[in-house]
Amino acid sequence: MDVKAAPNGVATIEDRILRITGYYGYYPGYSSQKSTTRSSVTRCKPGPNCPSSHSSISRQLSPLSVTEDSSAPILELQSRGSSGVCGRRVERQSRSGDDGTQTRPESSSQENGLKARCLSCTSMVLKTIWGLLIILSVSSSWVGTTQIVKITYKNFYCPFFMTWFSTNWNIMFFPVYYSGHLATAQEKQSPIKKFRECSRIFGEDGLTLKLFLKRTAPFSILWTLTNYLYLLALKKLTATDVSALFCCNKAFVFLLSWIVLKDRFMGVRIVAAIMAITGIVMMAYADNFHADSIIGVAFAVGSASTSALYKVLFKMFLGSANFGEAAHFVSTLGFFNLIFISFTPIILYFTKVEHWSSFAALPWGCLCGMAGLWLAFNILVNVGVVLTYPILISIGTVLSVPGNAAVDLLKQEVIFNVVRLAATIIICIGFLLMLLPEEWDEITLRFINSLKEKKSEEHVEDLTDVSVHLRSRSRVNGTVSIPLA
């Protein structure tokens, strides 16, 4: 229904409303021309044709204006509105495209991070499993060696011959290593090439006759002396006492490294060394300072001291060695023992110090079992450093003490009094303190701080949960509660 024009020139009700409300850009006849412009104005859609649509809108709206000044605000609003919508849509598309390109590398980096974490977790689990197996193997081989020596002493007591015989088995260390190399390595090398590669532990020129005599002789003597004193101690003391006293070598290694190699001073290791010395004195006191007990303790402490000196000199002159270099070096010690130290058991045999009736009377089963377990112990110690954490190897060594104690109790060869038990525990605790890393205090502080942060976070979460619960209850009851946090 048409409405007649009013005296003030307003033709329709819509024009009246627009005039009363003060619509920006109002001009007379706006409502009558609006219907014609709706059909001609096209909405802007995102795409390359958006600017052309803007120009068509301006061309179609320009005849509607009565004057240039009255139509300018409308054109400006129309163009701004349309360009704003189009621009926002185009910006959204471009942003979504940019976000898509940015999320792809982020997602790929997240996938790589997850893969790396999975691999690290898998390697950690494998190292732990290997560590547990090697702990059992190391402790079992050391306990077996000690107990077989005690059994052999019942019918055959020639400690130096037993030491010489077991040291000769070290020659098989490198062949065992090379067999593992052939079984696991992708690029296999010849025995001579691998031998030359591993001989770099002696220097860039490899193993020469001069280096063979200069470097191998002192280490071979220390190796033989360590094992010989250990076997002598087993004649005077029980297997539990000797294995516990031998654990003092960690304390002696620290003291020698601190004095000779100028290693870092650590108070906790000084405490461990004092505990080891205390355990030694208590072990001698356990039998009321009996003559055999004191001599046995001296032999065991001497074995631990020569073992510590061997390790410190190895670190000083040869440095660190990988598994192949260690296998080469131990096999070289076996060759040196076979060539240059064989005259010693011969002299002891003819001087009746270590004499046996015939070679057929020798307990070959016990001798081969002792030598095989000793070789297995040395191989496991060097393999364990490659497959798992070195600290687990040391734990396997200290676990030989309760292992020997269990066997001695079953054989009823030892009676544990309070002093002997306390001495054994003190030495084992000192050994474990020696295994603490150099940054153990910083690691402990970090761990304590992380625990405090977790507790504070849990406390804040509990407070927020309580406040949310109180709010919900107050809303149900129609009251307003003040949040606690």
Swiss-Prot record:
> Where would you say this protein principally sits, based on its record?
membrane
Ranges annotated as biased composition (Basic and acidic residues): 88-98
Q: Could you confirm whether the keyword Transport appears in this record?
A: yes
Kindly list the residue ranges recorded as spanning the membrane.
Answer: 129-149, 156-176, 217-234, 241-261, 265-285, 294-314, 329-349, 359-381, 383-405, 414-434
The highest taxon in the source lineage is Eukaryota
Q: Which SUPFAM superfamilies match?
A: Multidrug resistance efflux transporter EmrE
Task: Tell me its family.
Answer: Belongs to the SLC35F solute transporter family.
Q: What is this protein called?
A: Solute carrier family 35 member F4
Gene for this protein?
Slc35f4
